[in-house]
Swiss-Prot record:
GO terms for cellular component: cytoplasm. Disulfide bonds join 113-210. ATP binds at residues 12-19, 38, 138. This is tRNA-specific 2-thiouridylase MnmA. The gene is mnmA.
Amino acid sequence: MEVKVKKRVVVGLSGGVDSSVSALLLKQEGYEVIGLFMSNWDTIANFENNHEFNKTHQGCESELDYQDAQAVAQKIGIPLYRVEFIKEYWDNVFEYFLSEYQKNRTPNPDILCNQFIKFDSFLNYAKNELQADYIAMGHYARVKHDRNSSFLLKAIDTNKDQTYFLCNLNQNQLQNVLFPIGHLTKLQVRAIAKKHGLITANKKDSTGICFIGERNFKTFLQNYIPNQPGQIINIVNNQIIGHHIGTMYYTIGQRKGLNLGGMNERMFVCDKDIDKKIIYVAPSSFEKQYLISTQALIENINFIEPYNPQIPIMVRFRHRQDLIIVNDFLPIKNTKNVLINYESARAITPGQYAVFYQNDHCIGGGIVSKTNIGHQKVDFLVYKS
């Protein structure tokens, strides 16, 4: 990246190695770099009362990250500020997350976190309060700017590529963003951090829900959604074979944690009836019938750039999943929805995101509404009118 005039970049410094190296590289390239640490979750204000995290760590995980961010900022020689977007996160990300689980869908809060927090609230704060020309994040992605448009490209490190989580960004957001490590592999990023003595060089990658972190998922949800016990039924013979404490804790394709003993075959979750509080399971030998789909209705698609009908479209339903060929991409008139036919995919669930690619470009994504998995077949012709 050439820097003809000194531009101010505000980096989302999280206390992790990726954002640390992003800030370092920008400083080396001649930018005026400012670090900004976000706090977006408050365990007390957000009524998270029964998790071991509160009992043993007393909310210090975020503080430890902040201390690492401070150490990195001092080492690099940049100022570091701190900002809270707790209300914005609750209103735009977490309430949606809860509502989707109450509907027994499988949401992806990381996508909304990027859309509304990292690349909206953070961007606006950096622009308005810190007079930033750009913001930068430690995402494994690339952005290409031309005179009229910006394009989101896959990272060089395909195993770490995070464009899936950026599918809801718009042109205004991308035009103001830099991704300094998108051309590097994770090993290279750690090597750079180690070479320059950054405290985060060997720090493990963060996991769990965006800005909330690692939690026992059932225990965490119980803070906000009451248990709704019900039956587990074998869909093949309609026999009751177990019981559960809530359908929202299980996802399509799940095999672990079903607590079903004495079965001749391993069972997997294939459907859920919210009204009757039933989880349907099937034996592994029925996977093709009850888990494989070839067609889906995708709703509320965000296009980062217009798709080119002459270039093949690929889809990814999960982060790090292999790209799947889309045989038919059929926009539905007067909607932001599209019907897609694709090479077979396993355990695609309503609420997940379908993210579309053409060559190295991530062109956008939308939410899976329905699929044609076995017993869930839908007459999609109705959507073409």
